[in-house]
Swiss-Prot record:
Residues 861-877 have a biased composition (Pro residues). The modification Phosphothreonine is found at T605, T673. GO terms for molecular function: actin filament binding; alpha-catenin binding; beta-catenin binding; dystroglycan binding; structural molecule activity; ubiquitin protein ligase binding. Belongs to the vinculin/alpha-catenin family. Residues 858-888 are annotated as: Disordered. Phosphorylated; on serines, threonines and tyrosines. Phosphorylation on Tyr-1134 in activated platelets affects head-tail interactions and cell spreading but has no effect on actin binding nor on localization to focal adhesion plaques. It comes from Sus scrofa. Residues 837-879 are annotated as: Linker (Pro-rich). The gene is VCL. InterPro entries: Alpha-catenin/vinculin-like_sf, Vinculin, Vinculin/catenin, Vinculin_CS. This is Vinculin. Pfam families: Vinculin (PF01044). PROSITE patterns: VINCULIN_1, VINCULIN_2.
């Protein structure tokens, strides 16, 4: 099957596929219509010459290369493409003498398919060899990084730096060239991110090595911390380079592998957090006098939170046990806290409950450890299999290979057996074990032949190829087993989870592999995490909302399982669940915004205080104690920043890339924090040491840069206006605290309150500054900048007034001056917030008072008569709009029920938007802008009520034909998104709807359902044409958008579309060559279909994201833009 993970391969295969598609259509016309096939000797001769040239270049490369794998894999590709070319030549010769020859037509179609497949194989083999060149450079850097461990003198360090630099430069250049060549955006991003991390870590590595050498040679204190810093940096760089090597070898986006890696890291982190909190939690449970809500109880809540995260990453019985235990222990902890709050902490009931919670925490920890161990074992085995199979392939390619290759295969089989033993599905386990037996027998036979010196015989070569294929199949089976051991994955961002949940709520009877319920569980889990840091009634309120959603979800799932998912009771439950989810979402976002406002009000003070403690003079009192305290504060602060950022990613309005950016920055912060503390401790123990100071500054700046990046991403993830509202409310509360402090003569409390106000005001200035930099709208920039300047001028006077009143807190005059300063800050904050308010539309003036109207009994003058002899023509009747009825099922007709149901839904959607009189949609005034603030139609004309947006082509959706359901589901998903908007005056929506309908048609054609090869090829071309239109229009919108962030998002999404649509044309041609053919294996045909399905899903998802981003960009359009799109909701938000 063709792969096109590089632009070069795609650019070569596209014209080949285009020519093949012409031959396929000719074949079909001859086969179906009986048409004579024209003389093809000239074009076939051209193809033969091109193929001969390709094979010649390939053979020359094979003769000169030292790459054994290239030497092994190229000859079969040569044979394949040459045989295909021979068939084409024979077909052309036979058709020249008999244009109606049936065998010639068969040779034509088989030769065409072979040319496309063989060319793809040749190009892929060449590309893999190029990748291996890059990997060799990467592995050279990896090996040289280990040399850092033996560098112990400054001379060695200088030599090491000189040698490492050129290799790094070469690797960076090769990676940059490679990422530009890739067509998968995810792979490009991963390569760029990993390479950037390696570049950023290089000066840190040199700094860490320098401080290690310095402390070791001077025999100063801190050598242990220096060693930790150096080893951490080497390990981090090695991990990133290994990730580069892994991504370089990918030809498709492996979401499961990426998810498994992140899940393993998350489980390990959760387990470490549980272990660190366990003693504190148990101490609180043992002490009946401990206060409810203090650090001990919070430790229990955090343990349950971390265990819950692990439970969410498990499946089946393991998941139920962990989450069930968490819920039970949470309820029991509530009971213990309640008893202690009532002064009954020492009662037998409270003591018993506390002991049960303590024992339960041990049980829960053991369950989490088992889950983490199982996932890690399966993931490690999977990675080990990949490495061993890679080494085994080299052995299989070398006829004279030694016994080590056989050992690699045996090792891979042993790892695969471990995965099989951990499988919950017996069918999956037996399938893997069966493959192990087959591969073991084949390997033994091949090893015997090689021991006899017959490794180069045709039999041995065939066996080597057979073993290589079987190993690849085994790897696929083990990868699938690891993926299936994890639960259905919900989207990483809030809107994605809501959409997945909504799809399931709308149709709970459809099997979505549990994704919809997983999305709801994910939302509820985030709700619990937010509640854990809240106090009193706020926590109970959020927990109650979570429990309500849980309860309704379970009830709806139960009805669906009993086959009553469409019953009136189920529909009522679905409506309640929708409302409860909306309520939960709003409450979670409110709580998260408040937490971000509090935690991110000041991100750098703790690390600055740590720097002050680390540079304290040697004779400073309590120097060590102060440092330890500030180091602990810094670590706690960093942990809070990370936890809050994760909540913002999960509950905010961020897109997938922002969420992943937050997760990456949080991970980096967690890794860097202990390294910063180690660097600070080295400086503390080596006062005046310049190398120690420079190293600490390097680590500190890296931490600050990462946190600034995290802060920016968090700000992107939440609504700016909501953050400003929350900050304004927090400043009001701080002012109230200051009033209390002045009334109670508490200067320290006053200073704390004033400091908090200043920090929050500065945070607002930072947010405003970022938004000004992000916008190109001059009016908005001027308004925000003016309000920010005014706020900036109020901060210093307030701080000065606070200092004055703290020095003489009883002075009423000073108190009044301070409060006036505080209120001035509040007023300035309000003006900043108002600058972010969307402009209200200018409403028409109200009608005049009826009493002022002058009404008389005088009749209006008669109309002038028509010119003599003319008769007015009768008014023609309005064109009758037909609502075609959906075809009913005939008696005895066997239909595809899911397909019929999907088509009925689309038909009903079409009828909703009919403007036919009497239709309920027409009565509510479809076409009127639904949003009260008119945000969705800024700058666009409001359509008339009578405007018709009916689309009869929706009824062309297939009804009873066999279809490919995944492609249809992708088309429906895009169609649902597009039908939220009227297509009148909006070419993007019109093109998106066309694409959805065309893709639904393709879903019928790919299985050969009453369609033709020509129809399939033409359908793909039409989809590509509509794709180009969507891309062109999206780029026009991006050009006029004043919001840089939204513009970038839109361009990133829409630029994926042309590549995917080109691939769709090629894959459709491949599939067309297989339709109606009996000499194609089921496996080959299914593989072609799977690739087509995956491509269709990617295309529909990219267009859907483009529609959303284009709508967001249209709100921020230039006022002088000549290019406009009209965004009018068809379904008002209030319905």
């Amino acid at each position: 099957m063709p792969v096109f993970h590089t632009r070069t391969i795609e650019s070569i295969l596209e014209p080949v596929a285009q020519q093949i598609s012409h031959l396929v259509i000719m074949h079909e016309e001859g086969e179906v219509d009986g048409k004579a096939i024209p003389d093809l000797t000239a074009p076939v001769a051209a193809v033969q010459a091109a193929v001969s040239n390709l094979v010649r270049v390939g053979k020359e490369t094979v003769q000169t290369t030292e790459d054994q794998i290239l030497k092994r894999d190229m000859p079969p590709a040569f044979i394949k493409v040459e045989n295909a070319c021979t068939k084409l030549v024979q077909a052309a010769q036979m058709l020249q003498s008999d244009p109606y020859s049936v065998p010639a037509r068969d040779y034509l179609i088989d030769g065409s398919r072979g040319i496309l497949s063989g060319t793809s194989d040749l190009l892929l083999t060449f590309d893999e060899a190029e990748v291996r060149k890059i990997i060799r450079v990467c592995k050279g850097i990896l090996e040289y990084l280990t040399v850092a461990e033996v560098v112990e003198t400054m001379e060695d360090l200088v030599t090491y730096t000189k040698n490492l630099g050129p290799g790094m430069t070469k690797m960076a250049k090769m990676i940059d060239e490679r990422q530009q060549e890739l067509t998968h955006q995810e792979h490009r991003v991963m390569l760029v991110n990993s390479m950037n991390t390696v570049k950023e870590l290089l000066p840190v590595l040199i700094s860490a090595m320098k401080i290690f050498v310095t402390t070791k040679n001077s025999k100063n204190q801190g050598i242990e911390e220096a060693l930790k810093n150096r080893n951490f940096t080497v390990e981090k760089m090695s991990a990133e380079i290994n990730e580069i090597i892994r991504v370089l070898q990918l030809t498709s986006w492996d979401e499961d592998a990426w998810a498994s890696k992140k899940d393993t890291e998350a489980m390990k982190r959760a387990l470490a957090s549980i272990d660190s909190k366990l003693n504190q939690a148990k101490g609180w449970l043992r002490d009946p006098t401990a206060s409810p809500g203090d650090a001990g109880e919070q430790a229990i809540r955090q343990i349950l939170d971390e265990a819950g995260k692990v439970g969410e990453l498990c499946a089946g019985k393991e998941r139920r046990e962990i989450l069930g235990t968490c819920k039970m222990l949470g309820q029991m902890t509530d009971q213990v806290a309640d008893l202690r709050a009532r002064g009954q902490g020492a009662s037998p009931v409270a003591m018993q409950k506390a002991q049960q919670v303590s024992q339960g925490l041990d049980v829960l920890t053991a369950k989490v450890e088992n889950a983490a161990r199982k996932l890690e074992a399966m993931t490690n085995s999977k990675q080990s299999i990949a490495k061993k199979i890679d080494a085994a392939q080299n052995w299989l390619a070398d006829p004279n290979g030694g016994p080590e290759g056989e050992e690699q295969i045996r090792g891979a089989l042993a790892e695969a057996r471990k995965i099989a033993e951990l499988c919950d599905d017996p069918k999956e386990r037996d399938d893997i074990l069966r493959s192990l037996g087959e591969i073991s027998a084949l390997t033994s036979k091949l090893a015997d032949l090689r021991r006899q010196g017959k490794g180069d015989s045709p039999e041995a070569r065939a066996l080597a190829k057979q073993v290589a294929t079987a190993l690849q199949n085994l790897q696929t089976k083990t990868n699938r087993a690891v993926a299936n051991s994890r639960p259905a994955k919900a989207a990483v961002h809030l809107e994605g989870k809501i959409e997945q949940a909504q799809r399931w709520i709308d149709n709970p009877t459809v099997d979505d592999r549990g994704v919809g319920q997983a999305a709801i569980r994910g939302l509820v889990a985030e709700g619990h995490r937010l509640a854990n840091v809240m106090m009193g009634p706020y926590r109970q309120d959020l927990l109650a909302k979570c429990d309500r959603v849980d309860q309704l979800t379970a009830q709806l799932a139960d009805l669906a399982a009993r086959g009553e998912g469409e019953s009136p009771q189920a529909r009522a439950l679905a409506s309640q669940l929708q409302d409860s989810l909306k309520d939960l979402k709003a409450r979670m976002q409110e709580a998260m915004t408040q937490e971000v406002s509090d935690v991110f009000s000041d991100t750098t003070t703790p690390i600055k205080l740590l720097a002050v403690a680390a540079t304290a003079p040697p004779d400073a009192p309590n120097r060590e104690e102060v440092f330890d305290e500030r180091a602990a504060n810094f670590e706690n602060h960093s942990g809070r920043l990370g936890a809050t950022a994760e909540k913002a990613a999960a509950v905010g309005t961020a897109n997938k890339s922002t969420v992943e950016g937050i997760q990456a920055s949080v991970k980096t912060a967690r890794e860097l924090t202990p390294q910063v503390v180690s660097a600070a401790r080295i400086l503390l123990r080596n006062p005046g040491n310049q190398a120690a100071y420079e190293h600490f500054e390097t680590m500190k700046n890296q931490w600050i840069d990462n946190v600034e990046k995290m802060t920016g991403l968090v700000d992107e993830a939440i609504d700016t206006k909501s953050l400003l509202d929350a900050s304004e409310e927090a400043i009001k509360k701080d002012l109230d605290k200051c009033k209390v402090a002045m009334a109670n003569i508490q200067p320290q409390m006053l200073v704390a309150g004033a400091t908090s106000i200043a920090r929050r005001a500065n945070r607002i200035l930072l947010v405003a500054k970022r938004e000004v930099e992000n916008s190109e709208d001059p009016k908005f920039r001027e308004a925000v900048k003016a309000a920010s300047d005014e706020l900036s001028k109020t901060i210093s006077p307030m701080v000065m007034d606070a200092k004055a009143v703290a020095g003489n807190i009883s002075d009423p005059g000073l108190q009044k001056s301070f409060l006036d300063s505080g209120y001035r800050i509040l007023g300035a904050v309000a003006k900043v917030r108002e600058a972010f308010q969307p402009q209200e539309p200018d409403f028409p003036p109200p009608p005049p008072d009826l009493e002022q109207l002058r009404l008389t009994d005088e009749l209006a003058p008669p109309k002038p008569p028509l010119p003599e002899g003319e008769v007015p023509p009768p008014r023609p009747p309005p064109p009758e709009e037909k609502d075609e009825e959906f075809p009913e099922q005939k008696a005895g007709e066997v239909i595809n029920q899911p397909m019929m149901m999907a088509a009925r839904q689309l038909h009903d959607e079409a009828r909703k938007w009919s403007s036919k009189p009497g239709n309920p949609a027409a009565k509510v005034g479809i076409g009127v802008v639904a949003e009260a603030d008119a945000a969705d139609a800024v700058g666009f004309p409001v359509p008339s009520d009578m405007e018709d947006d009916y689309e009869p082509e929706l009824l062309l959706m297939p009804s009873s034909q066999p279809v490919n359901q995944p492609i249809l589901a992708a088309a429906q998903s895009l169609h649902r998104e597009a039908t939220k908007w009227s297509s009148k005056g909006n070419d993007i929506i019109a093109a998106a709807k066309r694409m959805a309908l065309l893709m639904a048609e393709m879903s019928r054609l790919v299985r050969g359902g009453s369609g033709t090869k020509r129809a399939l090829i033409q359908c793909a071309k039409d989809i590509a044409k509509a794709s180009d239109e969507v891309t062109r229009l999206a780029k026009e919108v991006a050009k006029q958008c004043t919001d840089k962030r939204i513009r970038t998002n839109l361009l990133q999404v829409c630029e994926r579309i042309p590549t995917i649509s080109t691939q769709l044309k090629i894959l459709s041609t491949v599939k067309a060559t297989m339709l109606g053919r009996t000499n194609i294996s089921d496996e080959e045909s299914e593989q072609a279909t799977e690739m087509l399905v995956h491509n269709a899903q990617n295309l529909m998802q990219s267009v859907k994201e483009t529609v959303r981003e284009a709508e967001a960009a249209s709100i921020k359009i230039r006022t002088d833009a000549g290019f406009t799109l009209r965004w009018v909701r068809k379904t008002p938000w209030y319905q």
